[in-house]
Amino acid sequence: MEQQPSVPRSCTNVARETPMNLNIQSTTGTRYELSVPPDETVDGLKRRISQRLKVPKERLTLLHRETRLSSGKLQDLGISDGSRLTLLPSVEAGLMSQMSRPEQSVMQALESLTETQVNDFLSGRSPLTLALRVGDHMMFVQLQLAAQQSGASHLQHRHVITRGAEAGASPQYRTLHTSTSALSHLASCTPGSTPPTTLSPTASTHRDGPHSSPLTTSVFRSHGEGVAVSPCAEQVPCSSRGTEGTSSSASSRSRKPGAIIESFVNHAPGVFSGTFSGTLHPHCQDSAGRPRRDIGTILQILNDLLSATRHYQGMPPSLTTLRCHTQCASQARNPKATSPQSSEPQQTTHPVGHCQAQTRTCKPSGDRLRQTENRATRCKVERLQLLMHQKRLRRKARRDSRAPYHWMPTRKSSRTSSNSSTSSGEGSLEIDFEDSLWKPDVKAELNSEFVVA
């Protein structure tokens, strides 16, 4: 007798977990059914409808029994299984809708993504392409997160952790399979011919802080890992950069959530590419430290990347400059890794001298670009100074025109400044109009009428 009440309880639990079927009917005649969980909210229902209709959810209006649904849970509003909802289209016209669309373009694009697209992007299987319009400019942004690495890359990552621990970093790291600490980059290259000893012995990896943990599936890369990136097509081994001071400062910064732009390449006018690394914010992670598979995680990554542009120091190098530095670093590192300890010093100094010669050839391009920008800035400053000087002269002429004229030098200077400021054809401020307009035999009482003109 005591087991009978447990049967309806299990039935009610199953009934609560079963989704509700809602009949959506629009005013244009479209009808379809939509299955939602029992604890679905109005905002979530609008998001599901917007994903199906490819319409922003801000332009959707739902009615239930002639009552507009704005917020709250569906069960609290009296909506149950089999309820009928009316969908009203929101029509906008004029310039107001065009001005408000750019502010909501990113959020609308993220909300239109399906769960499969979000999972593929966060796991690194597919890139995320966004078309943004700022004023009259159209920008195409493509983000690619590196996929989860395994095998040799896992061993390589573990070797970096070991060498970083020998350099004095904290030994508390997370493995690659549970929650990675070495978060990978956009274009990763695998050094196949170089031994593991060519990696930087002073590279320190990410420390696990109490409030932040790195993103799973290698979405970002560790702040302290000082490894430069080279394209895989060139087959150039990854070169190490950074010293003990920079690695220790980077490891201290890596505890804070956020992103850091590590490389930035200018391929052509208006075409840029680069790599970034960082740590995901704690509110985008679940209780196990894994990232949440929703658009909030993508939005947080975009915000971190945008805020990282303010802290990015240095001018974006060109593609040839980056390749030159990569080749120089690889040539300077290979003799040290292959030559024995008793090798002659001439063999190690020759590639370094060759590297310096290559860097000298790479410097003029950056210096020429810097000189061009300095010249353009100087021209702008001189133009602004000229405009300010002309404005100052016009203000002085306007002020002198309303003042009484008791002295001859004041009257002559005011007329000269007014004539020089109003003349637009000459463009010179040193023209003397006294010889053509002023005659010494004219009386001063008659001049007071046409001096101001």
Curated annotation (Swiss-Prot):
Superkingdom per UniProt: Eukaryota
Record's compositionally biased regions (Basic residues): 390-399
SUPFAM superfamilies xrefs: Ubiquitin-like
Main location: nucleus
Extent of Polar residues compositional bias: 330-362
Biased composition (Basic and acidic residues): 365-374
Keyword match Nucleus: yes
Keyword field contains Nucleus: yes
Chain intervals for the UniProt region annotation (Disordered): 185-219, 231-256, 330-374, 390-434
Subcellular location: Nucleus; Cytoplasm, Cytosol; Nucleus, Nucleolus
Start-end of Low complexity biased regions: 188-204, 239-252, 415-428
GO CC field: cytosol; nucleolus
UniProt keyword annotations, A-Z: Cytoplasm, Nucleus
Domain Ubiquitin-like residues, every copy: 20-94
InterPro entries from the UniProt entry: Midnolin, Ubiquitin-like_dom, Ubiquitin-like_domsf
Function: Facilitates ubiquitin-independent proteasomal degradation of polycomb protein CBX4. Plays a role in inhibiting the activity of glucokinase GCK and both glucose-induced and basal insulin secretion.
Protein name: Midnolin
Organism of derivation: Xenopus tropicalis
Higher taxonomy: Eukaryota, Metazoa, Chordata, Craniata, Vertebrata
